[in-house]
From Swiss-Prot:
GO terms for molecular function: structural constituent of ribosome. GO terms for cellular component: cytoplasm; ribonucleoprotein complex; ribosome. This is Large ribosomal subunit protein bL33A. It holds the Pfam family Ribosomal_L33. The keyword Ion transport does not apply.
Length: 49
């Protein structure tokens, strides 16, 4: 089963993206390099609670 997670920009804290991940990987946080429309550049986005 997959769980819905939200990705937030590390620089401004804006929650820009949602995605899903496996339930078995609950221990580690998901990170991705995505475009932030608030910062207007590519930044690291980290999974939020």
């Amino acid at each position: 089963m997959r769980q819905k997670v939200t990705l937030a920009c590390e620089q401004c804290g804006s929650r820009n993206y949602t995605t899903t991940k496996q339930m078995g990987r609950l221990g580690e946080r998901l990170t991705a390099n995505k475009f932030c429309s608030v910062c207007n550049k590519h930044t690291v986005h980290r999974e939020t609670k």
